[in-house]
Each structure stands twice: as structure tokens, then as C-alpha cells.
Amino acid sequence: MKYLVLGLIATSLVTLTACTDKKETTPIGTNTPTEMIQEKPAEAVDFTELLGHYDHMTFALSSDNVEETAKAATGMLAALQKIEGAHFDAEQKNTYQDIAANIKENAEHIEDNIGDIAHQREHFVEISTDIYDLVQLFDISKPYYKVFCPMVNGGEGAFWLSSAKDFRNPYMGEKMLSCGSIQEELN
């Protein structure tokens, strides 16, 4: 019995000593450096060039200038290509790709229809919706104003974005240059 008690005490001491050993162990598969598993934060995407061409298009349409409108469309297409490589998070990337595809399609129509300002203006309605979505979804530092003209689209009206409170109507051009009202201030 004496040996049994001594054996139990010895076993207990060995067990206690083994349990207090502060050896650091790393489970299998978790030795990846922290920097590698952290997601890279999405960087602010610079839409300055794209928005500059949109402003150019707005001014050209308000001046009834089909050639300058087409040049602005060409500039928008080039700006879209530069943005493609930007760092977006997964949700932003999907949203941006949808918006960019719409802008591209409509800018190509505007670019290809130099002699038809009515057709250019029809596609400008769509581009304005997409630019509005971009300004809403992404951090755009420049203020914009959503301006509505009730006279467009057979009386349905349409909006565009203006970078200034003193806007020029791209839908009516020289006929009704100041037609419209600011509905919303963005940023």
C-alpha cells in the first residue's frame, strides 16, 4: 500500500509539472503571418477624371455642341479603363462593374452619334443616372447638385448632376438654358 501511495504521488507530481510547462504550441495550419490573412482595406478610388468628362459633356450638351459632347464621351471611356484596375472591396467591385458597363454602353452611343444631339441627350439621361449612383455609393469629395428638368422625355422629366449651383440645362440647351431646379445636394 505504501508503494501504491508513493506511486500515485509521483504520478501526480509528473502530471502537475507537465501541465505547468509553458511551452507555446501552434496548431497546424495557423502559422500564417497575420498580415497575410488580413484583408487589404479598399483604397479611395479617384473618379475625378470620369466626373470631369461628365461635366464637360453636360456643358457641351447645354451649348448644343455635338462634337464636344462626343469628345467628352471618348474621355469618359478612357477614364473608365483607368478605373478598372482600382482597388474595390467585393461589394464595391460588383456595383462599379454594373455602373461602368452602363456608362460605357451609353458613352459609345453618344460618341457614335455626332450628328444627332437628340440621340446623345437620350443616352445622357442614362449616364446621369449612373453618375448619380457613383456619387452616392463612393466617397466623392467634390459637391454635386441633382438638378431636375420637367420638360424632358415628353413631360416626364429627367435629372442631371451639376458641379455648380448655377447650372446650365444639358437637355434643353440654348432653348431653355436655365430650366430646372436643384432637388438634392450631394456630399
Regions found by a protein language model. Give the residues of each.
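Positively charged n-region of N-terminal signal peptides that target proteins for export
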Residues: M1-L4
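Sec-dependent N-terminal signal peptides
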Residues: L6-S12
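C-terminal motif of bacterial Sec signal peptides marking the signal peptidase cleavage site
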Residues: T15-A18
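Mature extracytoplasmic or organellar-lumen-exposed domains after removal of signal/transit peptides
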Residues: E43-N187
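Short, low-complexity, disordered segments immediately C-terminal to signal peptides
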Residues: T20-Q38
